């Protein structure tokens, strides 16, 4: 059974050492702040999406359906969607990297427990 590293090189379970777990912990602690910042930015830009849509809706004329369509196709809303999408991509990238490191730690904990119990 192999664990796939994010960079594409395989890692055998026997190679999962305390050093690798330490690397995972360092990676997690070094990305705490940026992870939180990107999560906050995504939330902030979600509000920006609502504001851009509402602003464009209020400026549009026509029926409610027409105003809704104009708001969703406005430049202001498109810019807000682009900003939100870029922030979400950055957040997901760091979130996925952190989840990978957490899986490494979880697997190591399981293997260590199994070794202590003599199951491996």
Regions found by a protein language model. Give the residues of each.
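Extended alpha-helical coiled-coil "stalk/arm" regions
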Residues: 39-70
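Extended, surface-exposed interaction regions
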Residues: 23-49
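Terminal, low-complexity, charged helical segments
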Residues: 9, 16, 96-99, 119-120
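Short, glycine/alanine-rich amphipathic alpha-helical segment
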Residues: 61-90
């Amino acid at each position: 059974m192999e664990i796939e590293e994010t960079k594409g090189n395989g890692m055998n379970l026997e190679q999962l050492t305390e050093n690798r777990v330490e690397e995972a912990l360092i990676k997690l602690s070094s990305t705490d702040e940026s992870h939180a910042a990107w999560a906050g930015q995504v939330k902030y830009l979600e509000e920006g999406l609502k504001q851009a849509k509402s602003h464009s809706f209020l400026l549009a004329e026509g029926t409610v359906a027409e105003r809704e369509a104009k708001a969703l196709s406005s430049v202001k809303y498109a810019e807000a969607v682009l900003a939100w999408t870029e922030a979400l991509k950055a957040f997901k990238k760091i979130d996925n990297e952190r989840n990978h490191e957490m899986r490494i730690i979880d697997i190591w904990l399981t293997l260590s427990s199994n070794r202590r119990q003599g199951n491996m």
